[in-house]
Amino acid sequence: MIFDEFSIKTLIRPVPDFPKPGVVFRDITPLFQSPRALRMVADSFIQRYVEAEFSHIGAMDARGFLIGSIIAYELNKPLILFRKQGKLPADVLSESYQTEYGEAFLEVHSDSLCEGDSVLIFDDLIATGGTLIAAANLVRRMRASVFEAAAIIDLPELGGSQKLQDAAIPTFTLTAFALDDR
């Protein structure tokens, strides 16, 4: 299926003043209400990575799980879950980070990766880059490497994709929005 950026962007709903005043939240749930759009998004990532050399897909809590799991299934790659603090039952590694909303903690099971593994880290959106940089730090703490950071949406004005690139993390997104795009 050919990727149609316009069609995808029209299904990403802007929600002004959520979760706090001044923020325009990019709601991807309408993408999941359209089987065609969901397939288009998932297939775009699958086609990009089908021949790539990496060992795992790491998906961010919670919206990163939705597409990340499809990609992992289609590419036959192990899926590791990066969760918000307190959501994983076994031994974890934890990393603090800043979001556009404040400080948070990201966790992963400490036995998720081995030395030498290579991880595609995936989220729905790159804003400040905090979540993906925290995930990259956790990957590196397990002596693995980050293959690439990927997301559906980039908000370049918030600087996250640039921070990732400055940290030597290759970055890929399907589309971008200006902060004032409605």
From Swiss-Prot:
Does the keyword section mention Metal-binding?
no
Report whether Transmembrane helix shows up as a keyword of the record.
no
- Please give one Gene Ontology molecular function term for this protein: adenine phosphoribosyltransferase activity
What is the reaction catalyzed? Answer: AMP + diphosphate = 5-phospho-alpha-D-ribose 1-diphosphate + adenine
Gene Ontology cellular component annotations, sorted alphabetically: cytosol
Q: Name one GO biological process term.
A: AMP salvage
Q: Name one Pfam family in it.
A: Pribosyltran
Q: What is its main location?
A: cytoplasm
Its keywords, alphabetically, are:
Cytoplasm, Glycosyltransferase, Purine salvage, Transferase
Q: What is the uppermost EC class here? A: transferase
Pathway-wise, it operates in: Purine metabolism; AMP biosynthesis via salvage pathway; AMP from adenine: step 1/1
| Localization per record | Cytoplasm
Q: What is its EC number?
A: 2.4.2.7
Task: Say which family it is in.
Answer: Belongs to the purine/pyrimidine phosphoribosyltransferase family.
Q: What functional role does this protein have?
A: Catalyzes a salvage reaction resulting in the formation of AMP, that is energically less costly than de novo synthesis.
Subunit field text? Homodimer.
NCBIfam families on file: apt, PRK02304.1-3, PRK02304.1-5
Q: Write the protein's name.
A: Adenine phosphoribosyltransferase
Report the source organism. Answer: Ectopseudomonas mendocina (strain ymp) (Pseudomonas mendocina)
